[in-house]
Amino acid sequence: MIVRKSPREIEIMKAAGKIVANSLRLAKEIASKDVTTDYINTEVEKFIVRQGGIPIFKGYRGFPKSICTSINEEVVHGIPGQRKLRNGDILSIDVGVGYRKYVADAALTIPIGEITAEAQRLIDACEKSLWLAIKAIKSNEMLSIISRTIQEYVEDN
């Protein structure tokens, strides 16, 4: 059952989302050659806490860090560690924040330095398909329509 949120609840949800968005911006600024994903985790965690948020991944089912990081072909939801980022890496970061009983979660793909044309094409296709899917969302729209929008664009590009 979907419960409508009050204007106050929506404002709190927006605030949680803003903390996530700004956390991802910070991660993107920090992520560069020779930086470890553990360092990114530490800085993002400090930022979240300063904003009054709670990094919700930390401790969830034993997860030891505040953000999820995956480099290149690593499976999503990787644990930040001491590996230094290298030129050409593709870094995926997932951030989840609890704020006043609500949760926001988002992910971002960050190219490190110069990446291959193929990698950039894949990143671009994924981002474009996201915006097409958002545009396709309408009240009472079936999820399959949105999923098809994503699939068709990615397969064609």
Language-model regions, residue ranges each:
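Active-site neighborhoods and metal-handling regions in enzymes and metal-associated proteins
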Residues: 1-157
